[in-house]
């Protein structure tokens, strides 16, 4: 799917794919069904820019830098720094039919 690292989890009801780049949910697919999430054909999946599509982590603001109460100034990206940061997986467990992960 990409040139960036991904983490996958599968439970009886579905499968998911997450990348530590932006802690971004790339895919959620119920078993025997199509992917529920949209990922742009123009998405760059090499870690050089924010991913277009899926479910991004928007932090500390949503929108352009002008929407941030702190007014971060020129060079600040849309939706904050979180979606272009590489996150580290701290824990992963799989009790019963759940698949939680902590970033």
Please describe what each predicted stretch is:
Residues 1-103:
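Surface-exposed acidic/polar loop and edge beta-strand patches at domain peripheries
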């Amino acid at each position: 799917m990409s040139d960036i690292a991904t983490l996958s989890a599968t439970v009886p009801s579905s499968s998911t794919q997450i990348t530590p780049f932006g802690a971004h949910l790339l895919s959620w697919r119920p078993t025997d069904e199509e992917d529920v999430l949209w990922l742009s054909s123009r998405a760059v999946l090499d870690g050089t820019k924010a991913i277009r599509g899926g479910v991004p982590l928007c932090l500390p603001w949503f929108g352009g830098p002008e929407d941030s109460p702190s007014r971060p100034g020129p060079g600040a990206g849309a939706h904050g720094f979180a979606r272009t940061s590489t996150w580290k997986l701290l824990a992963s467990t799989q009790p019963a039919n759940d698949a939680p992960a902590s970033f």
